[in-house]
Amino acid sequence: QCKGRPVPQLEDVTEKAGIRFRHIANPLSTYIVESMSGGVILWDYDRDGWLDIYFTNAPTIEMALRKESARGALYHNNHNGTFSDATDKSGLATPCFAMGGAVADYNNDGWPDLYLTCLGGNILFRNNGDGTFTDVTAKADVADGRMSVGAAFGDYDRDGFVDLMVANYVDFQLDHLPPFGGKSLCKYRGIDVYCGPRGLRGAGDSLFHNNGDSTFTDVSKAAGVDDPHGYFGLGVVWADFNNTGWPDIYVANDTLPNFLYRNDGKGKFTEIGLESGTALSETGSEQASMGVALGDYLHNGRPSIYVTNFSDDYSDLYRNDGNWMFSDVSYASGVALPSFPLVKWGDAFVDLDNDGWLDLVAVSGHVYPQMEKVPASAGYAQPKLLHLNQKDGTFCDAGNLAGPALEEKRVSRGLAVGD
């Protein structure tokens, strides 16, 4: 634990801020897709200098079979600590079976646009600059159509237009639903739970090249990032990991090795996850890889990688040592043990105490509601994690020292940080 240093105090101001959004969830989590949604995005969609909020939402499978949708929510920042619901005006109310999303100005008109990852077809919303958005998915040709979870924009060919990388999870069809429980891969600690991802077919990933005319071309296979074996992709980030001037790609895969794609500067990527030390744990184990964040926590000019994982496993901190080499310093840095009992999801590097050094925060929540019946488990709702940077390559655990907001147990998925 952190001792002899001030710890930032975090307060839950949701009610004071006027945020009334509630995420829909099946209390039984009968299918794997019902445990996945819950993304959140901080972005200044109207360019007034204040961060606004978008929450993704998804229906239960029972609702989806009845063609019912779930209402997402856009909250406009009022500049006084409160927010106003701008969902109806914006046109972002009920877009899809939404998981997460990404923001970028894809058409270089100066306004940030919104891309949502969904089950059965993603959506690209063009920002019209007047508080409204237009669905341009068909024109842009970026629907994908599989179960997408993670997405990120990056200009891999440095032509001045952002491209789009999408991580896809499992092949999940509403007209061919997997059973609940029964099989060995559909049990956890002897209890029947939903099936997956093991036992289900994975889905490949997509890289869409921005053509500069508001359309995209799928170059996944040509670029070497299509994941032909169909791993269970969850998160994706872009970064110039070796300071070559070209953005590389990291994909976090559930229960399978992660990918690190090195950009060769000629439109192609080489997968070097195993060689770089970022594919597996320190002991060579495949992990759940449920959240991924980047940050130069050492001030060495190189982005390191933080990956959150399932319970009874630790979160990985891959220290970037340069020359495409990373070291798993999770235990040495102090971030491993506090994370072990929790099912970790969204994570971020953020300087919470304004000391100039990046700290680590992560949210947690089990995927199986049935865990409430297991006395030895951490339960379904779980607390958050906070690791403060000690400026020497290590972190101290401040999760239970930063106020009740972090200690309060919730079933969390997405995380976004901002002022």
Predicted features, each with a name:
Residues 1-419:
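Acidic, glycine/proline-rich Ca2+-coordinating loop motifs
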